[in-house]
A protein has these predicted regions:
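Short glycine-/aliphatic-rich beta-strand segments at the starts of folded cytosolic domains
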Residues: 1-17
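Short amphipathic alpha-helix segments
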Residues: 15-32
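Interdomain "pre-motor" coupling segment immediately N-terminal to P-loop NTPase/helicase cores
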Residues: 39-96
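A short, structured beta-strand/loop element
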Residues: 32-39
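Hydrophobic side chains in well-ordered alpha-helices
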Residues: 19, 57-60, 243-246
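Short, surface-exposed acidic/glycine-rich loop or hinge patches that mediate macromolecular interfaces
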Residues: 13, 51-52, 237, 297
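Intrinsically disordered, low-complexity linkers and terminal tails enriched in Pro/Gly
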Residues: 83-99, 315-328
Length: 328
């Protein structure tokens, strides 16, 4: 196939460094991810290579120009996410510019992949949403950001954050200390995310007033959760009975988000409540299932490689077990 060449010009009034990144970091990241040569000189960018890739690069720079014109600067990490969206058939990558929450530190929390964007859209448009996927895909963090945003907009009157306490067998009465002291180690990931979004003093005040509640799943039994945004984390560690119990706590003007990763179950010798729930509820109106993939992992790049390595190991182990069974 004959190579294609184009030349792009950074629009007048835009600093090229906003488009190319500090030290041309965006440019270098781009060249590592496309089958095309990209050369920048001054306010001009020349692209040469596979025609489809050249077109992809042109669409990427159209997005980068719009971001720069709006005062935003892409980072090298943004490049792969934008390209993934464009390769997925989206006309442009503006779908990722969907601010969920402005944290008290002034940091904008938004979806960073197309999968995360679809997950956020599912939560917004459904009463109950299941977010399923590996570690690092933002399942819980984005759900909590949407919950905090809903509370700030007075769409709900309270937040309830919960998870099963498998490590303690949920028999917290046998542990020493106050209830808060007993559950704190198991709830710490939820606290950490919450304190990343809201001022610590304000959060403590809302918790004292009962506007924000963080509690083990066992403490949801017998309640009706109305006018609330409820997030159930680590749902792969629920039993089928616990999952049914939780889902039937739904009250009026409430939204439930259930997050989990079936590859990280801590239940031993028991079937989890997340295993069959999609088969049971998959056709129920107003219930959504959002599946996040390895491509949606946005933690340190090494996390994605770790998840991939474990998946490959598990697949190989299952294949060996299957081969042994077939040889008998």
């Amino acid at each position: 196939m004959e190579a294609s060449k184009i030349r792009l010009t950074v629009p007048e009034g835009i600093d090229p460094s906003r488009v190319l990144g500090a030290g041309d970091g965006v440019l270098r990241a781009l060249e590592n991810l496309v089958r095309a040569q990209v050369v920048a000189r001054g306010d001009s960018v020349a692209v040469n290579g596979d025609p489809d890739e050249v077109e992809l690069v042109a669409r990427f720079f159209e997005h980068a120009f719009r971001e720069a014109a709006a005062g935003r600067t892409l980072s090298a990490d943004d490049v792969s996410r934008c390209l993934a969206v464009l390769r997925d058939g989206e006309h442009d990558a503006s779908s990722l510019r969907d601010d969920v929450l402005l944290s008290y530190r002034g940091r904008v929390i938004r979806p960073k992949t197309l999968g995360q964007k679809r997950y956020v859209d599912a939560i917004r448009s459904h009463t109950i949403t299941f977010g399923l996927g590996p570690a690092g895909t933002g399942k819980t963090y984005l759900a909590m950001a949407l919950a905090v945003a809903a509370l700030k907009r007075h769409e709900v009157g309270r937040l309830v954050l919960t998870r099963p306490v498998v490590e303690a067998g949920e028999n917290l009465g046998f542990l020493p200390g106050t209830l808060e002291e007993k559950i704190d180690p198991y709830m710490r990931p939820l606290y950490d995310a919450l304190f990343d979004m809201m001022d610590r003093e304000r959060t403590d005040e809302l918790m004292e007033r009962g506007v924000i509640e963080i509690a083990p799943l066992a403490y949801m039994r017998g309640r009706t959760l109305s006018d609330a945004f409820v997030v159930l984390d680590e749902a792969q560690n629920t039993t089928p009975e616990q999952m049914k119990m939780f889902l039937t706590r739904l009250g009026f003007n409430s939204k439930f988000v259930i997050t989990g990763d079936l590859s990280q179950r801590d239940l031993v010798g028991r079937r989890g409540g997340l295993a069959d729930v999609e088969r049971i509820l998959g056709r129920v109106d107003d219930v959504a299932f959002s599946h996040l993939e390895r491509a949606d992992v946005v933690r340190h790049a090494l996390v994605g490689r770790i998840v991939e390595a474990y998946d490959a190991y598990d697949d190989a182990r299952e294949q060996r077990a299957h081969d042994r069974k077939e040889s008998r």
